[in-house]
């Protein structure tokens, strides 16, 4: 009689980088014969991959750990919040193991301790696909190119959790990308803590892929990814000068004309307090130049309002900058102090919560008007749409200016008998728009 496969559940919180970590853990466990299940009652043990970026994320992590303990009882904790195990154990002393991010072997060993792998497991029978276990839909995947960050932004504690920049070998990254494309992935989302710093830590050394030399550098990586015939979308791009080299690749259709650049603010004073580059005037000139070279370019960004020391004048400067920049996709957060962040030690006036809320409301209204106007210009144009979902009401997809989960959608009505499926790319004509989404008809 064959022994029953041990079963593990996974809850992955936080950013796409953490999701990739969860995929790596599950891939290893699947290779050892574990079954991945979706419910507490079916799992022999539950792994919670936590987020510790801001206090609300920590609170959510603690809440989810508590729920897993209540519903299952056997819980292993990993991820960014696991850097300080004492905080987790103070609230949930019954957790079986606590580890920080990237500690894959320790997590797998902790699972072994709770529910050992089957001794009769035959890896030739329970084959794991070459691309590994993926927690995203089959048609898109995150491609993590590095870990850690060399910056010291005053509001952030990521370097203390994930360490300094460590770039993956370029050949390994491209091999993974090729496996993903071969498995049916239509969109690669390139992620890291600082995508444009890729290769800095290894002095852009030359690696090899498909027998050809390739520099460990963002531009060369993008050139190689652009040869694979799928959408390539760049996230978490820090605006170094060499980012300019990517624009011709976008204009030529090699990679998507989409840049996710977290500017965070525009006021020179606030940027200095944040320890961010304070070249907001040059940034506007660069954006103008980028769009002249690549008119289809979409720029997404995130900002923080209510940072210590932010005055009404600083905030108005930010709104005026947004008007000039005409960014396409924008997110905004109210500043929240993070334990251990250098910003807590700033000699700067704390912005009251009601003022933060007021500025957030005004920021969102201001940017919504900009986004709506920019999307209105898409009406009547033909666009290629990657389908994410299909139901009896039609299809929901994204075009090149929409990243999954964080940007807008394209809603498409389908005729009876349509064979459109998730993962298909179809041509559509835009018929309507609001501040976030588009409506279109299939051509």
Curated annotation (Swiss-Prot):
UniProt-annotated binding residues for [4Fe-4S] cluster 2: 149, 153, 156
PROSITE patterns: MTTASE_N (PS51449), MTTASE_RADICAL (PS01278), RADICAL_SAM (PS51918), TRAM (PS50926)
One GO biological process term: tRNA modification
GO cellular component terms, A-Z: cytosol
Cofactor binding, note field: Binds 2 [4Fe-4S] clusters. One cluster is coordinated with 3 cysteines and an exchangeable S-adenosyl-L-methionine.
One Gene Ontology MF term: metal ion binding
Primary residence: cytoplasm
Domain TRAM: 376-443
Residues reported to bind [4Fe-4S] cluster 1: 15, 51, 80
Subcellular location per the Swiss-Prot or TrEMBL entry: Cytoplasm
Superkingdom in the source lineage: Bacteria
InterPro entries: Elp3/MiaA/NifB-like_rSAM (IPR006638), Methylthiotransferase (IPR005839), Methylthiotransferase_CS (IPR020612), Methylthiotransferase_N (IPR013848), Methylthiotransferase_N_sf (IPR038135), NA-bd_OB-fold (IPR012340), Ribosomal_uS12_MeSTrfase_RimO (IPR005840), rSAM (IPR007197)
Reaction(s) catalysed (UniProt annotation): L-aspartate(89)-[ribosomal protein uS12]-hydrogen + (sulfur carrier)-SH + AH2 + 2 S-adenosyl-L-methionine = 3-methylsulfanyl-L-aspartate(89)-[ribosomal protein uS12]-hydrogen + (sulfur carrier)-H + 5'-deoxyadenosine + L-methionine + A + S-adenosyl-L-homocysteine + 2 H(+)
Cofactor dependency: [4Fe-4S] cluster
E.C. designation(s): 2.8.4.4
Similarity comment: family membership: Belongs to the methylthiotransferase family. RimO subfamily.
Function: Catalyzes the methylthiolation of an aspartic acid residue of ribosomal protein uS12.
Protein name as it appears in the record: Ribosomal protein uS12 methylthiotransferase RimO
Gene giving rise to this polypeptide: rimO
């Amino acid at each position: 009689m064959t022994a029953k496969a041990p079963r593990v559940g996974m809850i992955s919180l936080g950013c796409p980088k953490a999701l990739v970590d969860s995929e790596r853990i599950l891939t290893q466990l699947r290779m050892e014969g574990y079954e991945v299940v979706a419910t507490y009652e079916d799992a022999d043990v539950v792994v919670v991959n936590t987020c510790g970026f801001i206090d609300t994320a920590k609170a959510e992590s603690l809440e989810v750990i508590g729920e897993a303990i209540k519903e299952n009882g056997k819980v292993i904790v990993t991820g960014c919040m696991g850097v300080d195990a004492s905080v987790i154990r103070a609230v949930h002393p019954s957790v079986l193991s606590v580890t920080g991010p990237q500690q894959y072997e320790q997590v797998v060993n902790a699972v072994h301790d709770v529910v050992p792998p089957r001794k009769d497991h035959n890896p030739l029978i329970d084959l794991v696909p070459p691309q590994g276990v993926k927690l995203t839909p089959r048609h898109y995947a995150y491609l993590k190119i590095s870990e850690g960050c060399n910056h010291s932004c005053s509001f952030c504690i990521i370097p203390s959790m994930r360490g300094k920049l460590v770039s993956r070998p370029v050949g390994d990254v491209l091999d993974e990308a090729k496996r993903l494309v071969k498995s049916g992935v239509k969109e690669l989302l390139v992620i890291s803590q600082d995508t444009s710093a890729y290769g800095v830590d290894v002095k852009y050394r030359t690696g090899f892929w498909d027998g050809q030399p390739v520099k460990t550098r963002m531009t060369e990586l993008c050139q190689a990814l652009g040869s694979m015939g799928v959408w390539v979308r760049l996230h978490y791009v820090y605006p170094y000068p060499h980012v300019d080299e990517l624009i011709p690749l976008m204009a030529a259709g090699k990679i998507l004309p989409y840049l996710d650049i977290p500017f965070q603010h525009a006021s020179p004073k606030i940027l200095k307090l944040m320890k961010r580059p304070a070249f907001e005037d040059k940034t506007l000139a660069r954006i103008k130049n980028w769009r002249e070279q690549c008119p289809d370019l979409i720029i997404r960004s995130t900002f923080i309002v209510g940072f210590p020391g932010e005055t009404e004048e600083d905030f108005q400067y930010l709104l005026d900058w947004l008007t000039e920049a005409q960014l396409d996709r924008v997110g905004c957060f109210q500043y929240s102090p993070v334990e251990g962040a250098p910003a807590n030690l700033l000699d700067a006036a704390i912005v009251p919560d009601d003022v933060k809320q007021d500025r957030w409301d005004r920021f969102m209204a201001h940017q919504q008007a900009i986004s709506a106007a920019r999307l209105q210009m898409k009406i009547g144009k033909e666009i290629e749409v990657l389908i994410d979902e299909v139901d009896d009401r039609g299809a929901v997809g994204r075009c090149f200016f929409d990243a999954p989960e964080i940007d807008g959608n394209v809603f498409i009505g389908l005729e009876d008998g349509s064979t459109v499926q998730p993962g298909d790319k179809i041509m559509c004509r835009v018929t309507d728009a609001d501040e976030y989404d588009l409506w279109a008809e299939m051509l």
